[in-house]
Structure formats: C-alpha cells, structure tokens
Amino acid sequence: YVVVLPIPRGSVHPLLLWDTGGGHARPDPYHYVRIVRGEATGRSPGHDLLVVGGEDHKTGQDADAEGHYDALEAWTRERFPVAGPALHRWSGQILEPVDALAHIGLDPGSNHPVYVATGDSGNGMTHGTIAGVLLTDLLVGRENPWERLYDPGRVTLGASGVYARENANVAGRYADWLRKGDVASLDDLARGAGAILVRGLRRLAVYRDLEGGLHACSAVCPHLGCVVHWNGVESSWDCPCHGSRFDELGRVVNGPANRDLAPATLDESARAVVLPEGPIPAPEGPIPANPGAT
C-alpha cells in the first residue's frame, strides 16, 4: 500500500529510506519512504510530496484494505507531523522469493531456452540493472560470478522452513471451497461491489456495476483451482494461493494465471446462475517453486 501526503517544501531533507521489519523473518510491518520535490510534479506549489509505502500482506488474504491505508497514514503522521491531508493512495503487487534473492537466469521449468528476471521483492530498479548485466552475459556465453547466486533453479536449504510454511499456507486456502458465500442473495450486492455466491457445488464471482447491471463468472482461478476473493479497493478478483488477479469482469490482469475466469450467465428473474456446460478447465501447471506473492 502507498499513501502520498504534502509537506512544506524543504521541511524534510531529500531521502530514500526503509526499515528492516517485515519479510519472511519478522512479522513487523515493512515501511519505505521517499521525497518527491514539488517542482518535479508541477502540481504542488510550496510543497514537496512524501511517498510512504508498507502494510504488506499476501495477495487475496486480507479484506481490510481500508484498515491498512489508515494504519499506514497513522504511522506516517506519527513520524512526520507536518504532513497535510493525503493526496493519493494505491496498492500494488510484488513477488517475494523465499530466500529474499531475485530469480535471474534460465527458467528451469521451461522446455525452451527462456530467461527470466522476477522475484524483485520490491527492488525492481536494482534487480533490473543486475538482470541487464547478468542476462546479457548468459546469452552471449560469458561467465558471470552472479550466475549461481541468482539461479532460478537454486535450492536454498536455509529457506526450506519458509518454503514449507508458504506451501502450507497455499494448501490451507483450498478450505475456501467449504465456506459460505459472501452474500446469500444477489439482492444483497451493492453497486460497485463484488461477492462470491455459492450455488450448490459452484462458486461464482458476481459483480454489480455502478448502473446496477450484474456480471458473473466462475470464482475458480484457472491456474490451480483456488477460489478468488473480491478486492473492494482495487475492484479486482484476487487469488489467495499464487497471486493471480482479474478485473471486475473476470479478465486476467496478473499471472501466474494466463486466461480469464470462466464466464457464467445470470437469470435475474430467477436469481439463478448458469455456467457453461462441461468440466472446469484443468489447471495450467504445477505449483511454482516459490509461492508467495504479496
């Protein structure tokens, strides 16, 4: 999560800072702060902008986004009391490797020579630069001392406990198949909101647009079959297992899923849900070696 607040120009020296909380080793919320000079934006005369991020959690596993924004703003005001009313806020998604190092190199799960750069843990600028050097060397056959360090196929024994916990967390999310829906009736669904509706053995992701129209699709993530959750702040369907995300109409936005949620139709007069005939599409592949999108 990120919030942006104005501060009097020059009241805080130019900086980029972060704390050492959070991550796999510690449960403390992780925070990072930077200053954007007002003249760089052209929209804040007499002010600089304080950009503060933090309050991370795994994608699809926390429904209280507003609470995280509130906590982040409170943390900011406690340390920067000169900050004015919040101007902007947004949330994003990053990939966290279990051993805290990015995956840069030949993809061990591909049948073709595919090179990847992922698992940035929020440090995309740094890892992007490293990847530019390392991948160039790998492609031209030049030795690079970082190759083994960032090898996507590496096995890090010291991170085995984290790996086991993350996979146990993923397995636990399949219990969503046993839970009740978010609403008992479509009449309970407000405009601009989405909810999981249970009809027999089916889980449906239903969204009511601002004009009152209803849109439905399967709530089953096409990657490995978890039930997606509604993200009311970003108006998206988020998979709590491996971090796939879909827009309010079920169109894929972020992998590992590479296709949309299966369509469904609504018979509004009977409040019934009809899914296409045939079995649910098979999962797209094995569980990745390093789950844990946040």
Identify the residue ranges that each predicted region occupies:
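C-terminal catalytic lobe of FAD-dependent flavoproteins
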Residues: 27-28, 38-47, 58-163, 217
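Active-site-flanking beta-strand signature of metal-NTP-handling nucleotidyl enzymes
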Residues: 50-53
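Rieske [2Fe-2S] iron-sulfur-binding domain
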Residues: 195-290, 294
